[in-house]
Amino acid sequence: MKKQAELYRGKAKTVYSTDNPDLLVLEFRNDTSAGDGARIEQFDRKGMVNNKFNHFIMSKLAEAGIPTQMEALLSDTECLVKKLDMVPVECVVRNRAAGSLVKRLGIEEGIELNPPLFDLFLKNDAMHDPMVNDSYCETFGWVSKENLARMRELTYKANDVLKKLFDDAGLILVDFKLEFGLFKGEVVLGDEFSPDGSRLWDKNTLDKMDKDRFRQSLGGLIEAYEEVAHRLGVKLD
């Protein structure tokens, strides 16, 4: 497998083609963004931590029967993934109230949500990822009813797997987002799972161990990411 041209450069990752039309190289950079890319800073080791963290989580989800795009870890900051036809809608599961939900409904941060909430957002930075629903997806042809149902099913299944994984590590999985795509007609989990796209709190102190440390200028971002990885048993070095 040979890495070729840069195809896409996002806020924190770069995608490259390979000599295999079904495979891509996903590179995790040290960039960290907030406000849909309005604020960007670089943190040493972040690309490495997120790459290895993502590979670890995707492996756990694959073991649980969730199809993922992950193929192999290539280096400290790169992994080999299937080339997906990405769905332009992301799935969010909320186990506790935080972030935009608190602002939107005026509820207390941290209250438990039982059953968990499931939200859909259109992936569009310029419009700040507006919330949408099943009806929008059908009307605008973003994803079929069948594939959306499968995305919802896999998201809830991932939540069951990951809640226990993090709980066993002394962490609360507050919420997270997942992105899906199609590979040869099958719904497959793509993009990444890392503290960039999830909220993780310490069970005892409720300290935030995710990108909210950057969003809210709390400091200690990489230290928190590495602590989460350490608790899970992710091998970083």
UniProtKB/Swiss-Prot annotation:
A molecular-function term among this protein's GO annotations: ATP binding
A GO cellular component entry from the record: cytosol
PROSITE patterns for this protein: SAICAR_SYNTHETASE_1, SAICAR_SYNTHETASE_2
Entry-linked Pfam families: SAICAR_synt
GO biological process, one term: cobalamin biosynthetic process
InterPro entries named among the record's database cross-references: SAICAR_synt/ADE2_N, SAICAR_synt_PurC, SAICAR_synth, SAICAR_synthetase, SAICAR_synthetase_CS
Pathway: Purine metabolism; IMP biosynthesis via de novo pathway; 5-amino-1-(5-phospho-D-ribosyl)imidazole-4-carboxamide from 5-amino-1-(5-phospho-D-ribosyl)imidazole-4-carboxylate: step 1/2
UniProt entry keywords in alphabetical sequence: ATP-binding, Ligase, Nucleotide-binding, Purine biosynthesis
Domain of life assignment: Bacteria
Broad class of enzyme this protein falls into: ligase
Catalytic reactions on record: 5-amino-1-(5-phospho-D-ribosyl)imidazole-4-carboxylate + L-aspartate + ATP = (2S)-2-[5-amino-1-(5-phospho-beta-D-ribosyl)imidazole-4-carboxamido]succinate + ADP + phosphate + 2 H(+)
EC code(s) of this entry: 6.3.2.6
Family listed: Belongs to the SAICAR synthetase family.
NCBIfam families named among the record's database cross-references: purC
Name of the protein described by the UniProt record: Phosphoribosylaminoimidazole-succinocarboxamide synthase
Species of origin: Klebsiella pneumoniae subsp. pneumoniae (strain ATCC 700721 / MGH 78578)
Primary gene name: purC
